[in-house]
Every structure is written in structure tokens, then in C-alpha cells.
Regions:
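Switch/communication elements of ASCE P-loop NTPase nucleotide-binding domains
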Residues: 1-55, 224-350
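Extended helical coiled-coil dimerization/tether regions that scaffold
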Residues: 2, 9, 100, 104, ...
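Conserved P-loop NTP-binding catalytic core
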Residues: 43-123
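Coupling/switch segment of ABC-type P-loop NTPase heads
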Residues: 73, 107-206
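Secondary-structure edge/capping motif, primarily at the C-terminal ends of alpha-helices
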Residues: 75, 261, 365-369
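A structural signal for short, well-ordered beta-strand segments and their strand-loop junctions
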Residues: 128-131, 213-218, 226, 304, ...
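Soluble or luminal CAZymes and related metallo-dependent hydrolases
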Residues: 193-197, 246, 285, 353, ...
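RecA-like P-loop NTPase motor core
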Residues: 291, 295, 310-413
Length: 413
């Protein structure tokens, strides 16, 4: 499917600095220091997309500009202080606001905006903003119901925002429908389709929770789903950890949209904006979340913000822009997280305690009076953590070992 955003031109929030971000239809990862304006920027991108695509304001621009010229002429020919003059003045002010809503920052270059607008009208095209503070609100199911959902709910601002809350209800409906397809209707094809959907959902749970023992268990007496996992008490969608709740606030909404429309998730397109995509996530999940969403909903273009080097290095199909540096970085998927931490953020991947030990070893290596015993004591403090040392730390560790050998063998520096 076509990805629609080609370029974003804007001023950095709270500054006069103009920036141009080239997306070329790729995902966008925004990074930068706290207070650099990432959240303000993604908020403004979302509002602009709503204005120019969902509200069709881009289509109206030429008409507004023509109307403005008309009212400027009316004002010119009217006597100041007259009702005609006041009417013209008010119309010009109104049209200025409408024109400004399209032409003001950010300026978003869209590849085939009419096609994007058509897809949004059909509800296959999404324009979603998931704020930094997000938790899933998946509701309990009380009974089984049909799966012919009202597509009109997607157009309604209130009900459309809550479709993700119906995930457990949808699962109950699918289990019930599968049972009827076997016992009442003898519909083998339907039974296989539902079984595959549920199996795929189970596989997604295993992937996200990094545990092959994870599976859904349905309590048919209470219309309740439990997530079972070896070594843990069964738990529900209502008491997910904050990290998984953050993920499901995104996943359940997009998944339920495809179910409302009775299409594969791969048929959805548009733009999903996720502020602080790494919020509350363990580092292993930070590596997985953007690739997972990109593979689950491949037609959607993602714009995300993050501080995490694990997110920055997790995908190759993304442009990365550092707002603090006003710099487009490009693909970082081939870089280690240590090099990203130090190169992009200027932060060492080693802890303060480790850095102190390394500095001490470096001094001893340079000191001609250092004894093998002193170096061996320092090396022993590091070797238990050798597997997790960064490149610089491993270099000094090996240099210390080399110095010990030279001293013992009587070799000069």
C-alpha cells in the first residue's frame, strides 16, 4: 500500500528554526532531548492532517483565496464604518483563519492527497494520535453478541475512540461464533478462518511477551479471557502491566478497526502517530514494538517519538530526525545501541561505576610502576561482567591483560 507523507517542513516548536524532514513514504522516528519540542511537533502534525485530509481543507484552499479577493474588493468599495465594510472585514478575518489552518506550519507534502482522503472516507485510512500517557481500557464482556459491527461508529468521535475497548468482547464473540459454526451450521470454512485468527492473536501474545508458554484461556461460564503463562498466576486484559497496557492501547484500536471493516489488518493505511513509543517498555520490547506494528499493519505509516537507542536501531524502513541537533540522521539499524548512545545522545553506555573502574585501569596501564598484582585486582573486578562490557571497556580490559604479560615476560613498553 502507498505511504502518503513525503515531507514535513516546519519551524521547531518555541524557536524560529526552519527544518525540513524528508520521509519519502517511510516511517519517521523523532528524537531529541527533553523539552526539544517532539510532543508539540507530533501534535501539530496530527492536527494538520485532520484539517487537510479528514476535513478536506486542502481542497477548499483555492476557493477561500478567491473568496478573500472578492471580500477585499467589497471592503475597498465600502465606506469604513458601514455594515458592508464590517461584513467584508469579518469575512476576510474568517477566511484568513481558514487559509492559515492549511498553509501554516507544519507544511506536509502528501503523495496523492485525494487518494489519502478517499481512504480516510472509507475508514480504511487512519489518522490516529496515541499520546505519551496511554493505557488500554479493554472492557469485560458480559455476554456474546454478533460480529456485524456498526461501521458508522468509526465516524463518531466518541465511539470511534473507544473501539479498542471492545477487544475482549470481540474475542468472546469469535469463540461463540466458532462454536456455532461447528455445532449448528457445519461451516468448516468459517471455523477454520476464526481458528486461524485466534491462533495468530495467540502468536502475537507470545511474541510480545517473549514467552512461548503464553496462551489465551476462555472461561465460557463467565465469558472471560485469561492470559496464562508458566510460573505466573493467570491474569486478564484489565490488569496488564503498564508496558503491555501501553502496547494494547495501540494494538487493540487498530485491530478492532480492521474487524469493524471486516478486512485484513494489512488493508489499513494512513498515519499513526505514537508519542514516546518506548514508554514503560523493557529494553527487549523497545527493540520489538515498532517492527511488530509495522509488520502487523504494513500499510500504515508510523510517526513516533523516542529517547530509546533500541527503538532507533530497530528498523531499517524509517527516517530518523534529531530535533535537538536539527539533523536528519537516516537509517541506524546497522549500528549498535552503544554507538547510538554515544554518537547521537553524547552519553556513554557504561555506568558511572564501570567508567570509574575503566579510568583506574587506564591510569595503571600508563603508570610504569604498576605491578601485575594491582592490574589483576582491577581486572578481576571487571571480568565477571565481561559479556556485557562495551567496546571501550573491553579494549582497556585486554590492554591491561597485555601489560601484565609484558611485565611478567620482561618486555618493555
Amino acid at each position: 500500500l502507498k505511504k502518503f507523507i513525503e515531507k514535513i517542513s516546519t519551524t521547531v516548536p518555541y524557536t524560529d528554526d526552519q527544518i525540513d524532514i524528508e520521509l519519502h513514504g517511510k516511517n519517521l522516528i523523532l528524537t531529541g532531548s527533553n523539552g526539544s519540542g517532539k510532543t508539540s511537533l507530533v501534535d501539530s502534525i496530527y492536527k494538520k492532517l485532520i484539517d487537510i485530509v479528514r476535513s478536506k481543507k486542502l481542497d477548499e484552499l483555492k476557493g477561500w483565496e478567491k473568496q478573500k479577493l472578492h471580500w477585499i474588493g467589497q471592503r475597498y468599495n465600502a465606506q469604513e464604518g458601514s455594515s458592508k465594510y464590517q461584513q467584508a472585514k469579518q469575512q476576510i478575518e474568517r477566511l484568513d483563519r481558514e487559509i492559515d489552518s492549511v498553509t501554516s506550519n507544519p507544511n506536509i507534502t502528501i503523495n496523492d492527497h485525494l487518494e489519502f482522503s478517499r481512504m480516510v472516507d472509507s475508514e480504511l485510512g487512519v489518522i490516529e494520535l496515541f499520546p505519551a500517557v496511554r493505557q488500554s481500557q479493554i472492557q469485560d464482556a458480559r455476554s456474546a453478541s454478533g460480529t456485524n459491527y456498526n461501521k458508522g461508529d468509526l465516524n463518531n468521535q466518541r465511539s470511534g475512540a473507544q473501539i479498542g475497548n471492545q477487544l475482549e468482547q470481540h474475542l468472546v464473540n469469535l469463540y461463540t461464533r466458532r462454536s456455532f459454526s461447528i455445532t449448528e451450521h457445519r461451516n468448516e470454512e468459517l471455523e477454520q478462518d476464526i481458528t486461524k485468527w485466534l491462533s495468530d492473536f495467540d502468536d502475537n501474545l507470545k511474541f510480545l511477551m517473549e514467552d512461548q508458554s503464553v496462551h489465551l484461556n476462555f472461561d465460557a461460564d463467565n465469558f472471560k479471557f485469561y492470559i496464562k503463562q508458566d510460573g505466573k498466576e493467570p491474569y486478564t486484559f484489565q490488569n496488564l502491566s503498564s508496558g503491555y497496557s501501553s502496547i494494547f492501547s495501540v494494538l487493540s484500536k487498530l485491530l478492532m478497526r480492521s474487524e469493524y471493516l471486516k478486512v485484513s489488518p494489512s488493508k489499513l493505511c494512513g498515519v499513526a502517530i505514537i508519542d514516546e513509543i518506548d514508554a514503560h517498555l523493557h529494553v527487549t520490547l523497545q527493540r520489538k514494538i515498532l517492527p511488530f506494528l509495522s509488520e502487523s499493519f504494513p500499510g500504515i505509516q508510523y510517526i513516533v517519538t523516542t529517547h530509546s537507542p533500541f527503538v532507533l536501531t530497530s528498523v531499517s524502513n524509517a527516517e530518523i530526525y534529531d530535533i535537538s541537533r536539527r539533523e536528519q540522521v537516516g537509517d541506524l539499524s546497522s549500528y549498535s545501541y552503544e554507538s547510538v548512545l554515544e554518537g547521537l545522545f553524547g552519553v556513554s553506555s557504561a555506568s558511572d561505576i564501570l567508567q570509574n573502574k575503566i579510568r583506574e585501569i587506564a591510569k595503571k596501564i600508563e603508570d610504569e610502576n604498576t605491578s601485575p598484582g594491582e592490574l589483576e585486582t582491577l581486572i578481576n573486578k571487571l571480568e565477571s561482567n565481561q559479556d556485557i562490557l562495551d567496546e571501550e571497556s573491553r579494549f582497556y580490559l585486554n590492554s591491561a591483560k597485555l601489560k601484565i604479560n609484558k611485565i611478567k615476560n620482561g618486555v618493555g613498553e
